């Protein structure tokens, strides 16, 4: 007996197929064969006739296997919630022809399935992404390295006179300027807050924050920007807080999405202000920090400013659109731009 999925992963809300494969290699038929397994209730069967749902989904399917027969049954499922899901074993029950004797066997399975964070539409992600790119471009302009030559282009009125290449201008008959690479690396560190669980509003805000992190990171990696992701959320596989290290190239986007799929939001996580203070000693001044956090009660802003040491940063703030104004964050910062995201 083998249980598998026809895809390794789907995005939240998408569909896949769970495939049950039964092989009877014996020279005797099996008139009744019951195959049972359990998995997370957040992977939903379209046909719930043979399923019992409580804290888990318990599935029981009945087969009749002829002599040396292979049976394949496909069951459509939908990923209802982001997560990393496993099926560890199946229980197989068979009976004799008279239905008087029962045999039970257990088959280990190594079935893994990822439901990745939900996609966010381009129209919604465009504003925060353009703000990130704008900060990266402005930082490059401020910190051009005169020793890192990157080519020649036409003169613009905003260019300093010291950048004019007089020899090239004389040959071309028009003013040309030298281009320089930046002393700052094009690197963004995404700080993701996963604190809280239990209420529909809290869960929705956390899931939105995780989806924003995934979407922004994928776009930045595709544009050649290095990305690191750090979160107080706990990896359900190794039990540690997420810290990806530096990722480069569009091919690492799927790896990051898988890591985010495994994040567990809890009430007992390290508070974001404390995590920011912990990160301060190892901070890289050249990185652009992007905080994604719904936190509006604890004093996050001073610790974020201390982490960036006065450099520009962005705080994407998912918030409940029904939240009363008196509970909303009113603090402002010269160096941290707060981008509100209604959910």
Regions found by a protein language model. Give the residues of each.
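An amphipathic, basic-hydrophobic helix/alpha-beta surface used to engage anionic
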Residues: 1-239
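Exposed, interaction-prone extracellular/peripheral surfaces
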Residues: 157, 161-343
